[in-house]
From Swiss-Prot:
GO terms for cellular component: plasma membrane; proton-transporting ATP synthase complex. F(1)F(0) ATP synthase produces ATP from ADP in the presence of a proton or sodium gradient. F-type ATPases consist of two structural domains, F(1) containing the extramembraneous catalytic core and F(0) containing the membrane proton channel, linked together by a central stalk and a peripheral stalk. During catalysis, ATP synthesis in the catalytic domain of F(1) is coupled via a rotary mechanism of the central stalk subunits to proton translocation. This protein is part of the stalk that links CF(0) to CF(1). It either transmits conformational changes from CF(0) to CF(1) or is implicated in proton conduction. InterPro entries: ATP_synth_OSCP/delta_N_sf (IPR026015), ATPase_OSCP/dsu (IPR000711). It comes from Mesomycoplasma hyopneumoniae (strain 7448) (Mycoplasma hyopneumoniae). This is ATP synthase subunit delta. PANTHER family: ATP SYNTHASE DELTA CHAIN. One of its GO terms (molecular function) is proton-transporting ATP synthase activity, rotational mechanism.
Length: 187
């Protein structure tokens, strides 16, 4: 398993080398997020691309049809290579590894801002600015609506969670009540 993991991480490293040589790292990061989003929203594509009953040329045609007009040509060809080498099952790990390597190269990071409601790009930018100062590197945030928050926000950057929401307040209150009840029952 380790060799297999190392093998497909090599694809991410190669993609990084290409994007650096083309001075197009940021565009490739955005294109990778686009690819992840398209496939996440169309799970049937994973079944199609990992199927041995669908010919390679047919897979290439589908990749062209979906992505050619929307992402860099190198990334279209990159998707064809991982489809050809039967690694499409690992597309997500490969692209996420590329994003991580590219962010490290650019001294930046990506995170997610979750709210119970839509927020303006100005507000998102202000959170990016605050977090960039706090973390000492450029932070880009992608917005996601999370109805479980009820109100407030949750920001996740580099496995750190910054949260101020009614949901988190209720969760904390529940934990404190349980702790208080356990302490009271012990007496």
């Amino acid at each position: 398993m380790y060799l297999y993991k190392k093998n497909y991480y090599g694809y991410a490293e190669s993609l990084l080398d290409i994007s650096i040589s083309e001075n197009n790292v940021e565009k490739y990061i955005n294109d990778c997020f686009f690819i992840l989003s398209i496939i996440q929203n169309n799970q049937v594509l994973i079944l199609l691309f990992k199927s041995h009953f669908v010919g390679k040329q047919e897979k290439f045609n589908i990749i062209d049809k979906i992505f050619s007009a929307k992402i860099e040509k190198i990334l279209v060809n990159f998707l064809k290579v991982i489809a050809k080498n039967n690694l499409f099952l690992h597309y997500k790990q490969i692209l996420l590894k590329y994003i991580k390597l590219a962010n490290s190269h650019l001294s930046q990071t990506w995170g997610e801002i979750e709210t119970a409601f839509p927020i303006s790009s100005v507000m998102t930018s202000s959170f990016e600015s605050i977090l960039s100062k706090k973390l000492g590197k450029k932070v880009h945030l992608r917005h996601k609506i999370n109805s479980k928050l009820i109100s407030g926000i949750r920001i996740i950057v580099d496995n750190q969670i910054f949260e101020n929401s009614l949901f988190s307040e209720l969760k904390l209150l529940k934990q404190n009540l349980k702790k208080h009840l356990i302490t009271k029952n012990d007496l």
